[in-house]
Every structure is written in structure tokens, then in C-alpha cells.
A protein has these predicted regions:
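PP2C/PPM-type serine/threonine phosphatase catalytic domain
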Residues: 1-292
Length: 292
């Protein structure tokens, strides 16, 4: 990514109702070889009673980290599929061992960036969005009952958002012995922004609001503000946002802006005037001493 550098920020909150935060957020830069960096971005939204959702979400993240830190291939798609498969097997086995009443699961959205290449892996109803040219586009596909209804034309997007069945997901890690992962491959352009979020966030914010915040704020600040606004809008779920900006190098390397109302050369002019005044003062003192 010679023309841009990835800047990442994240925020997560248990929300106003739940004691435990069953969301897990992860981002890190892994260096395989010099100049070959992988940036891993992930959000998992766990589910299950007795804090089992929190365990499932963390197991998914831990498995993802394990797979990419012990990489024996440079095939990102393959590693993603392997990470999802292994995480599903571990979560399913752990939940099954405790009996049906302790079954657990989690969504997982992962973005892997290498150079200008972006690969998204997804299971569940957490989402990955791309902001390009001031427009927000959902990359991932929700694995939920209402999403399937919308796809079949049986329900509108507005009806899906208000539906009492909106939290019923049709695919998750740990629910079955095997799981299918959706893979999306894109090319990042300078000034693109990526948002990965749990449903506690995107179910309560309008697209235009999310775009505005990401364009006007840094990734860290926009992630925090989106989480805060989702809670203000009535979210009772755990709320998570991870924002990545492909910041143009020209923007990052630009000199800091001059304070408002202060001309660009103001500091330099003040310095010159002080020096001129000092020279005049020394000349006057010298003249007085010469005349006495």
C-alpha cells in the first residue's frame, strides 16, 4: 500500500443493560517478512447463557490469531477458511461437552489487509462495510432470518429492522459441526474506509450518520462516537465498532495546519521583528556609550 497507510481505531461497550460484554474486537499488524505486513481486523459477537457467549467470541479470536501467527502459506483466503473451520470445531466441541443447555456460538467478521488487497471472511450477522467516495456499501451478507426474508422479497429493509425476529441468525460458529464461511476479495483505494461492527451498532445507526462520522473523525474517535450514539439511540446489546482508514500518504506526511486566524508566516515574521528590535536596541546602547 505505497500510496496509503492503514490507520485503525476500535471501540466496544457492554451497553446499558448487559453486565458482560460478549463482543470481542481485535486488530493487529503481523509482519511475515520485511515489507510483507498483514493487518488483521476482527469483530466477534458471542451468544449463549452463563457467559458462554463471551467465551465463544474469545475462542474465535484466539483461533484466528493462532492460525495467522503460525502461517505456513501466503494464501490469505485459505488461512481464513482454516481459521473459521477450526474455530467452529473448537466452539462446537466445547459447547457440546457441557450439554445442550450450555451450547454457545459466535458471529465472526474478519478483514485481512496486505498491500492494497482486502479479504473479508464472515459468518453471522456482524457486518463489514466499505466507505468509498462518500458512499457506504455493505460487503458482507447477513446470515439471519430477516435477511433471508428481505432477499426473497417477503420483507422490506425497514420491516427487517423493526422485526421481533431480527436477532435470529441462520449461521454461526459453534452451532453445527461444520460451517460455511463467506469470502469477499476487494482492492483498497487511497482514502477508503472499512467498518466492521456488531449488530448492537449497525441496527441503531443510519448509514448516513456512520459515513459522516467516519469522514469527519479519526478512526479511533469515529469508532467511539458511533458506539456512544448507538447506545443513545436505544441499543440494549453489546456495541462494537472497528474502523480502518487507508490514509493517503500525502495527507499523513503533510505539515500540521496553522492555527485558525494565524497567517502561515506569522511566527517567522514575529521572530524577524524581535531580531530587528534587538539590533536597534544594541545600536542605541552603543551610540550612548560612545557619546559619554
Amino acid at each position: 500500500m505505497e500510496d496509503s497507510r492503514l490507520v485503525v481505531g476500535a471501540a466496544t461497550d457492554p451497553g446499558p443493560v448487559r453486565e458482560q460484554n460478549e463482543d470481542a474486537v481485535y486488530h493487529n499488524v503481523l509482519v511475515d517478512t520485511p515489507g510483507n505486513e498483514l493487518t488483521i481486523l476482527a469483530v466477534a459477537d458471542g451468544m449463549g447463557g452463563y457467559q458462554r457467549g463471551e467465551i465463544a467470541a474469545q475462542m474465535a479470536i484466539d483461533t484466528l490469531i493462532e492460525r495467522f501467527t503460525s502461517a505456513d502459506t501466503d494464501d490469505i483466503v485459505l488461512m481464513l477458511k482454516q481459521a473459521f473451520r477450526l474455530a467452529n470445531e473448537r466452539i462446537f466441541a466445547d459447547g457440546s461437552a457441557e450439554g445442550e443447555h450450555n451450547m454457545m456460538g459466535t458471529t465472526l467478521v474478519v478483514g485481512v489487509v496486505r498491500g492494497n488487497d482486502l479479504v473479508i471472511g464472515n459468518v453471522g450477522d456482524s457486518r463489514a462495510y466499505l466507505v468509498r467516495a462518500n458512499s457506504l456499501n455493505q460487503i458482507s451478507t447477513d446470515h439471519s432470518l430477516v435477511a433471508e426474508q428481505v432477499a426473497m422479497g417477503a420483507m422490506t429493509q425497514d420491516e427487517a429492522r423493526e422485526s421481533h425476529h431480527k436477532n435470529i441468525i441462520t449461521r454461526a460458529l459453534g452451532h453445527r459441526q461444520r460451517v460455511e464461511v463467506d469470502i469477499f476479495e476487494l482492492t483498497l483505494l487511497p482514502d477508503d474506509r472499512l467498518l466492521i461492527s456488531s449488530d448492537g451498532l449497525h441496527d441503531y445507526l443510519e448509514d448516513d450518520e456512520m459515513v459522516e462520522l467516519m469522514l469527519q473523525m479519526s478512526p479511533e474517535d469515529s469508532a467511539r462516537e458511533m458506539v456512544a450514539r448507538a447506545i443513545q439511540a436505544g441499543s440494549t446489546d453489546n456495541v462494537s465498532a472497528l474502523v480502518a482508514w487507508a490514509a493517503p500518504v500525502s495527507v499523513l506526511d503533510a505539515p500540521p495546519p496553522v492555527a485558525a486566524g494565524e497567517p502561515a508566516g506569522a511566527n517567522r515574521m514575529i521572530t524577524i521583528l524581535v531580531l530587528v528590535g534587538l539590533v536597534i536596541f544594541i545600536a542605541i546602547i552603543g551610540y550612548i556609550l560612545l557619546m559619554t
